[in-house]
Amino acid sequence: MLNRRAFLASMTGAAAVTRLAAAPRRPNIVLILADDMGFSDIGCYGSEISTPNLDRLAQRGLRFTQFYNTARCCPTRASILTGLYPHQAGVGHMIQDRGVPSYQGYLNDRCVTIAEVLRTAGYRTLMSGKWHVGEDRPHWPTDRGFEKYFGLISGASNYWRLDEGRKMAMDDKPWTPPPQGFYMTDAITDYAVKFIDQYGRGPEPFFLYAAYTAPHWPLHAHPQDIQKYEGKYMKGWDELRKERHRRQIEMGIVDKRWPLTPRDERAPAWETVEDRKARDRAMAVYAAQVDRLDQDIGRVLAKIREIGAEENTLVIFLADNGGCAEEINRGVKGVPPGPPDSYFSYGLPWANASNTPFRLYKHWVHEGGIATPFIAYCPSIVKERGKIVHEVGHIVDLMATCVDLAGAKYPQTFNGKPIQPMEGKSLVPVFQGRSLGSRKLFWEHEGNRAVRDGKWKLVSRYPKEWELYDLEADRTEMNDLSAKMPERVAQMAKDYAAWAARCGVKTPEELGKKTKQKG
């Protein structure tokens, strides 16, 4: 029997022989993923951080206001790559095997990746960045459809050097960063640009997945980038949230009817904070990470223009989850955030600002954990420049979108194994000004659970009871209607239970004692 890689090679060859000259040529697809970045952290979503390249994409393309991820790094990556809910792909939690198929910690053989599907359709398949859906062979990117790979197989790591126990790879071989001159965001970009230069000039279209680690902790950034922001956050998180919310309303990203959520009760009022200078430094380094991410995305876009591919390259940008409230401080004592010997996160109060106007964070499935910026730009596909889209989208839609644009066929079987049907819808109609219609979407992570059905959202913060919100009137989830509408709660809870059973969702109690994972 052919193994997965041999099967792909044979199918790719067949596709090359039988492929007809397309007019117009099928689009290149560049999918850019940020890590642990909040809803309001880039300029075109209300931020003060300088992100001119992403802002320009939004001005010339479209922005979604209601696009969702799965609240955590590994599950989001599994869903993006497969078009399935993470449990269906085997990554219901993180990369640890929890003893049941839906939580095995790596992509299973009942799913296919975008790379596997597009490669059989004649695309060159390229990846640079964070994988985090399979630590060991044969579960690396080159085992799952990518011809070329550079990046971090594992989760978060020091930006300046590889943390002990973390893995990087070049194609199918381990790779170690040089002792000097390495910075993770820049390195991911270097290889993304190199791959476009090498494979973007040929007759075949290409798919590039650029999965950055920025701005995930630890807070590491170039001194010149930090310098731009140090001192700018002495105004504090309370004022920052108000300013971002005001800009979001002016932009049309947020409805003025939706109140800004109160400051998280665990975050102190800024005027009571004693270590303000240290807090300012932390947010300045975080902003510098976002700034550098945008600079490097600019390098990717410049290379696309250089090879003459801008007109027919779809560029998509989004984040894997909301801002992260985890408190991390394990670097060398006395070293501030930024250099290699530091190891900090920016903490809950700044994460609360990152997720403006929503509440809660990465891990949770309230809007603060799952709402992401989403930008799509392609002159030949996205016709309405600067449009703000209020359609509901989800990362499961990315597989269907890529299959649609590539003229590919999503398989019922692959390498002799039955493949689960896609869960998402193609976003191409939205790119062309049409509607996707009403839909039901589901979430579960660490016992936190949610259902969205049209304007209604049923959500629970584990181990609490269900809450019900009308997101059309109350996107910031301030007015719980569950007590007033028990019938709707019961019906949506029934829908959730059916989905959970179908997808192999387990409660924390069923999985046993939870193990902390770096993500």
Language-model-detected regions and their locations in the chain:
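Formylglycine-dependent sulfatase
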Residues: 2-462, 466, 473-494, 498-501, ...
